[in-house]
C-alpha cells in the first residue's frame, strides 16, 4: 500500500483500533459482572449492578456505528487530525459515561452530553467535506484549506465542558 495513502488514514485507523479495545473492555465488564452473580453461565438479567453494566454497554454499542461513520467520513473528506482528536475525545467521554453509569445515573449525564457534542462536530466536519466536494464539482471552488483551518482551530474547543 502506498505510504501517502496510509498516512492519510493512519490516525483514523489508530482511533478505530483503540475503540475496539474499549469495546472489548466493556464486554469483559459485562461478562465479569454476569459470572460474578450467576455462576459460570451468562444471563441477561440479574442484580442491579449487572443491569447497570449491561445497559451502559448496550448504550455504548448502540452509538458505536454512528461514531465510526462520522469519524471516518470527517477524516477522509475534511481533515484527519481534527477528526482523530475528536475521536479520541469521544472515546474518553464514552469511558466517562460508562463508569458514570455504574454509579449514580446522574454521573453519566455529562459524558452523554459531551459525547453528543463531539458527534455533532464530526458530523459538521463530514458535511463540510461533502459540501466542498460538490462546490468543486459544480463551481470549481475549493474551500478545503479554509475548512481544514477552521476545523483544526475549533477542535480544541471540544475540551471546554
From Swiss-Prot:
GO terms for molecular function: arachidonate binding; enzyme activator activity. Residues 1-8, 78-80, 129-161 are lumenal. Required for leukotriene biosynthesis by ALOX5 (5-lipoxygenase). Anchors ALOX5 to the membrane. Binds arachidonic acid, and could play an essential role in the transfer of arachidonic acid to ALOX5. Binds to MK-886, a compound that blocks the biosynthesis of leukotrienes. Residues 108-115 dip into the membrane without crossing it. Residues 31-52, 103-107 are cytoplasmic. It comes from Mus musculus (Mouse). Homotrimer. Interacts with LTC4S and ALOX5. Belongs to the MAPEG family. Pfam families: MAPEG. Keywords: Endoplasmic reticulum, Leukotriene biosynthesis, Membrane, Nucleus, Transmembrane, Transmembrane helix. The C-terminal part after residue 140 is mostly disordered. GO terms for biological process: cellular response to calcium ion; leukotriene biosynthetic process; leukotriene production involved in inflammatory response; protein homotrimerization. It is a multi-pass membrane protein. GO terms for cellular component: endoplasmic reticulum membrane; nuclear envelope; nuclear membrane; nucleus. It is found in: Nucleus membrane; Endoplasmic reticulum membrane. It comes from the Eukaryota. The chain crosses the membrane at residues 9-30, 53-77, 81-102, 116-128. The gene is Alox5ap. This is Arachidonate 5-lipoxygenase-activating protein. Disulfide bonds: none annotated.
